[in-house]
Structures are given as C-alpha cells and as structure tokens.
C-alpha cells in the first residue's frame, strides 16, 4: 500500500469519525425521549425523599464517649420545638468558590477562578437557581416514623448571612442545626478548604428523647439539562453530558442525559463509590464515606434528571448519637486537584473516552503534556513539545511505513507486467502477485500497520486537547489568546492547507487512478475548511504534526535515493 493510499485512509477515517459524531448528535436530538415522572414510592416525611427506609443500607449508631450521659446538657443543639418558616439563604465564600445555600441545598455555586468568557469578569456558575435550567445539590434526611428537617429546617448557628474565608486562614467552618421535637437534633457542619472545590458536609444526629430515632440521609444532584447548540466545531456539544458513577466492584460507568432512563433507575447498593453529573470541563459529585453503603439511584422528576445516594440508615437510641459525612465536589476537572482527593476512580470524570484503553492512553498523554507545561509554562508550547516527542517516538514506524512504500514503488513495473500478462484473470494475477511479494519479502500491509498503531494515539490526543480544562482560555502567543477558541484570523488553518498541499506534492503516486487523484486534490481544502472553526489548540497540533511529517517525508525521500524535485514534477503531470 503506497503513501497516498495510507494518507487517504487516515484522512477519510478522520472525516468519517467527525461526521459520525455529528450524525449521532442529530439522531439523538431527534429521538430524545420525553421526560417522564419518577416512579411512585411510599411516602416519607421529607418531600424530597423517594424511597422507603427498608430499601436503604443501614449503619450502626455510634455512641458518643460510650454512654448516654456523655451528651452534654449545655450543647448548642439542646432540643427545642421544631423550627418553622424558611431559613434565610447563607453565602459562603472561599478563594475559589462562592456558594449560596439554605443549610440543606446548595442553590448557587460560582467558580471564582473560571470566568465565563476570556475577557469577562462573570465567573462560571455551575449550580444555579435559573428558572429554565435549575441545577442544585441537596442533602437531607428522611424517615417514615420519626421527625426530620424539611425545606428550610436547618438554621445557621452563627448570626449573619455571609461567611468568608479570611486571609491567613485555610479553613472556613460554618455549622447549621435543626432542632426537632422531643429532644432530637441534627447538627450539620459545612467545611471549605483553601484552594479546594470539595465541600465537606458532616451530619450528627443527637437523640436526647426517650425513644429511638430512625431515619436515613439522602444526597442528590438534580438538573434540567441545557440544550447545547450542535455542530462539530462546538466541543461542548459532543463532550459527554450526563451521570457517572463508580463502584469498586463494577468500576466506572456512565449514562448520558439523552438516554437517562433507558436502562432503568440503577438501584444498586454500593460501598466506597461516588456519583457525579458531568459536562464539558466541569462537574458536581457526591462522595460519601468509604465505609458507609448507599443505594445509588437515577431518576427523573419532571424535566429534572436526578442522581441520588440514599443511606446509610440509622437507628439512634435515646441518649446516643450517630454521624455521617460526605464531600460535595463543585468545580472543574482539574487533574492535579482530583488526585489530592484520593478517591478511587474519580480521575475518570476527565472523560477522554468511555473505553478504558483509550482513557489510559489519554491519561498518559496528558501526563506528558502537563510535565512539559511545568517546564515551558505555556500550553501552546507544551502542545508543540508533545507533538515533537510523539513524532520522535513514532519515527521508527514512519520509517518502516515509507520503506515499505518505497519498496512497493520499485516493483510497480513488475506488477504492471503481471497485470498485463494475466489480463482479466484476477485469481491468477493475485496468486502471481503474492508469489512476488513472498520472493522479494514485501509486506503489502507494511504501510498500513504503522497507521493503525498511530491512530489510537492521535484520537486520544484529540480528546485530551478537547477535554482538558487546564487549556481552557489558555493563550499561546500573539493572535492566539485562547487555545480552546478558533483562530480569529484563520492563520493556522491556512498554514495547515499549505502543509497538506506540500505533503501531497511530495507523495509519490505511481499508478494512481484518476478518482484518487481528484480526491487528493480536494483533501487539503476539505481539511482546511473543517479546521477553520476548530479550537486553535487542535489546529496547532495538526500544523506542527503536519510540518514535522513534511520534513520527515523530505528526509525519507533523500535517504532512499529518490529526488524530491522529480516526485514534484511527476505529480504535476
């Protein structure tokens, strides 16, 4: 297989992959199911609870200091009549987050270090009370028999409605409390750490009544998905949007919003896992205690898609207490910060691919890219450095590919003679051809195998550049001030066309039929138009990769005793 056919295969595979993704989005939009209401369940005292306690994993009640008397009589959570009326909204601000919450639900969440636009000042709002597309995180308690806090039940223990992480402090702690009837109270503590998007939420149930208290905690994420503008030039539209979850037994799984209830409501008991809602560059997740089991549920509540953890359930004896803790992640898919959370499988939210092998390749490529960035301090130069390293690593394959093509070209006259000799007898022609290949030790697939080996790397790198939030709004130099936006002056796409055209002229084309020749003439223009509206980081990759490929092509031609000028003249005929 000559260089031209290899190039054509690679080019058309790329076009086919992009067209397939575009067709898949259009088909999904046309066939999107109408949201349905969640299934009926036994009533619970909490309006947001959706399952009977019998279906929820239990946890052992944990006594304080070993005896009922250990619960201090002067605690700030001394039993009082149940609180009535809606609690005022509280604002918590750290160096990276601004949260609006009511003690039970996080209603708004702004990511202070991520502006919505390159030149804007408005931060990305991940959780929102927007009437058209609400998106919030809720943690509450439910019970079939015992009193529990409802909407507005939690109250801040400290006066005021605004709490901010002060300079010199690394931790912001804001406690809330619900005082129920008959001496039962739940104390909830929100903890924000400097530089972290993980919010710790710890609940302690204290029972000072004379009867056992029964209930379970639930934690959920719910949103009305945003309808994204479709198009192969819009990475948001073909990045994964939906629910993901992880269990030590089953590993990482996911379900897109458009297919949310196709496989049922999940209803799986998991210990040591997590659940998340993903979108391009950002996500939210509930990460419960590793040693406490929860029932994982996917559901729809009208237009809302819901991912929920139910449990553990507690039976708290009189004079005893029980506690449970979880982390709520509200933030970007920053690989360095995800690693600090020490949560198994959480790195998969950076969705390089749903296939494990491609995800592993993508993680490896990003590891190299991030280390290059630590030295070069610029993501554009890091992309160029990565392409250079890949080209060096794949040079033996490129050399083998060209060597195979050169050998095939030398035997083109003999193949033409065989074709003339056997005429329309294809069986004899193929038999004679295979005997010639065997005698001369020619591998007809020698030019194709290197391509097949390189393709997973190239596709994985594409998703690394699209999915990595680290590159979001990152500049390169001069006119490229955002590697995730298109080239404003189309300089890189034009360079890409020129490099592809020059590569085409340097590619020997013995025996090419007229149809292939016409396809080759239009290929640089097709790719140029396609790349014109792609993110500049991707086009930069193609320009550098193509430029290095052109230099390698020139070098290979001279190494095998051929003259570039003769090839150019032959292709001009």
Swiss-Prot record:
<keyword id="KW-0812">Transmembrane</keyword>
<protein>
    <recommendedName>
        <fullName>Membrane protein insertase YidC</fullName>
    </recommendedName>
</protein>
<keyword id="KW-0653">Protein transport</keyword>
<dbReference type="InterPro" id="IPR028053">
    <property type="entry name" value="Membr_insert_YidC_N"/>
</dbReference>
<dbReference type="InterPro" id="IPR019998">
    <property type="entry name" value="Membr_insert_YidC"/>
</dbReference>
<dbReference type="InterPro" id="IPR047196">
    <property type="entry name" value="YidC_ALB_C"/>
</dbReference>
<dbReference type="GO" id="GO:0051205">
    <property type="term" value="P:protein insertion into membrane"/>
</dbReference>
<comment type="similarity">
    <text>Belongs to the OXA1/ALB3/YidC family. Type 1 subfamily.</text>
</comment>
<dbReference type="Pfam" id="PF02096">
    <property type="entry name" value="60KD_IMP"/>
</dbReference>
<feature type="transmembrane region" description="Helical">
    <location>
        <begin position="524"/>
        <end position="544"/>
    </location>
</feature>
<dbReference type="InterPro" id="IPR028055">
    <property type="entry name" value="YidC/Oxa/ALB_C"/>
</dbReference>
<feature type="transmembrane region" description="Helical">
    <location>
        <begin position="379"/>
        <end position="399"/>
    </location>
</feature>
<dbReference type="GO" id="GO:0015031">
    <property type="term" value="P:protein transport"/>
</dbReference>
<dbReference type="InterPro" id="IPR001708">
    <property type="entry name" value="YidC/ALB3/OXA1/COX18"/>
</dbReference>
<comment type="function">
    <text>Required for the insertion and/or proper folding and/or complex formation of integral membrane proteins into the membrane. Involved in integration of membrane proteins that insert both dependently and independently of the Sec translocase complex, as well as at least some lipoproteins. Aids folding of multispanning membrane proteins.</text>
</comment>
<keyword id="KW-1133">Transmembrane helix</keyword>
<dbReference type="Pfam" id="PF14849">
    <property type="entry name" value="YidC_periplas"/>
</dbReference>
<feature type="transmembrane region" description="Helical">
    <location>
        <begin position="355"/>
        <end position="375"/>
    </location>
</feature>
<keyword id="KW-0997">Cell inner membrane</keyword>
<dbReference type="InterPro" id="IPR038221">
    <property type="entry name" value="YidC_periplasmic_sf"/>
</dbReference>
<keyword id="KW-0813">Transport</keyword>
<dbReference type="GO" id="GO:0032977">
    <property type="term" value="F:membrane insertase activity"/>
</dbReference>
<keyword id="KW-1003">Cell membrane</keyword>
<feature type="transmembrane region" description="Helical">
    <location>
        <begin position="446"/>
        <end position="466"/>
    </location>
</feature>
<feature type="transmembrane region" description="Helical">
    <location>
        <begin position="6"/>
        <end position="26"/>
    </location>
</feature>
<feature type="transmembrane region" description="Helical">
    <location>
        <begin position="488"/>
        <end position="508"/>
    </location>
</feature>
<comment type="subunit">
    <text>Interacts with the Sec translocase complex via SecD. Specifically interacts with transmembrane segments of nascent integral membrane proteins during membrane integration.</text>
</comment>
<keyword id="KW-0143">Chaperone</keyword>
<keyword id="KW-0472">Membrane</keyword>
<dbReference type="GO" id="GO:0005886">
    <property type="term" value="C:plasma membrane"/>
</dbReference>
């Amino acid at each position: 297989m000559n260089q031209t056919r290899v190039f054509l295969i690679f080019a058309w595979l790329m076009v086919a992959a992009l067209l397939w993704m575009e067709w898949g989005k259009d088909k999904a939009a046309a066939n999107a199911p109408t949201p349905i209401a969640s299934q009926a369940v036994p009533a619970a005292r909490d309006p947001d609870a959706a399952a009977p306690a019998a279906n929820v994993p239990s946890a052992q009640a944990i006594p304080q200091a070993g005896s009922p008397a250990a619960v201090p009589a002067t605690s700030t959570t001394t039993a009082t009549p149940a609180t009535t009326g809606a609690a005022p909204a509280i604002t918590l601000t750290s160096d990276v987050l601004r949260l609006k919450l009511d003690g039970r639900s996080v209603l708004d969440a702004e990511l202070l270090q991520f502006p919505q636009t390159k030149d804007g000042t408005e931060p990305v709002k991940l959780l929102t009370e927007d009437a058209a597309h609400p998106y919030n995180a809720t943690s509450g308690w439910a019970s079939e028999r015992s009193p529990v806090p409802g909407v507005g039940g939690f109250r801040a223990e400290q006066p005021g409605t605004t709490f901010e992480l002060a300079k010199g402090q690394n931790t912001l702690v804001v406690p809330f409390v619900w005082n129920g009837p008959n001496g039962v109270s739940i104390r909830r503590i929100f903890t924000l750490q400097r530089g972290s998007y993980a919010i710790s939420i710890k609940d302690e149930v204290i029972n000072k009544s004379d009867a056992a208290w029964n209930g379970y905690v639930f934690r959920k994420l719910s949103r009305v998905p945003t309808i994204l503008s479709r198009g192969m030039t819009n990475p948001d539209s073909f990045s994964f949007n939906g629910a993901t979850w992880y269990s030590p037994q089953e590993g990482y799984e996911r379900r897109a919003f458009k297919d949310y209830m196709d496989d049922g409501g999940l209803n799986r008991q998991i210990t040591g896992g997590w659940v998340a809602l993903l979108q391009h560059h950002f996500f939210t997740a509930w990460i419960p205690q590793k040693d406490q089991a929860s029932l994982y549920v996917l559901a729809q509540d009208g237009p809302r898609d819901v991912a929920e953890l139910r449990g553990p359930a507690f039976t708290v004896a009189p004079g005893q207490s029980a506690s449970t803790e979880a982390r709520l992640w509200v933030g970007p898919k920053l690989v360095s910060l995800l690693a600090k959370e020490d949560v198994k499988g959480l790195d998969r939210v950076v969705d390089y691919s749903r296939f494990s092998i491609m995800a592993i390749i993508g993680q490896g490529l990003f590891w190299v890219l991030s280390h290059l960035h630590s030295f070069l301090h610029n993501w554009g130069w890091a992309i160029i450095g990565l392409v250079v390293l890949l080209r060096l690593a794949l040079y033996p394959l490129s050399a083998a590919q060209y060597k195979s093509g050169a050998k095939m070209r030398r035997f083109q006259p003999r193949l033409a003679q065989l074709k003339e000799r056997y005429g329309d007898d294809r069986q004899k022609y193929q038999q004679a051809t295979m005997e010639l290949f065997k005698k001369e030790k020619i591998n007809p697939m020698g030019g194709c195998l290197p391509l097949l080996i390189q393709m997973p790397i190239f596709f994985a790198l594409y998703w690394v550049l699209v999915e990595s939030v680290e590159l979001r709004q990152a500049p390169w130099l001069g006119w490229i001030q955002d590697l995730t936006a298109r080239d404003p002056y189309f300089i890189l796409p034009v360079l890409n066309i020129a490099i592809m055209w020059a590569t085409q002229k340097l590619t020997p084309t013995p025996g090419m039929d007229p149809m292939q020749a016409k396809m080759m003439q239009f290929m640089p223009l097709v790719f140029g138009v396609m790349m014109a509206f792609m993110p500049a980081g991707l086009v930069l990759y193609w320009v550098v990769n193509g430029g290095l490929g052109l230099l390698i092509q020139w070098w290979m031609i001279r190494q095998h005793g051929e003259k570039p000028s003769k090839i150019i003249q032959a292709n001009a005929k």
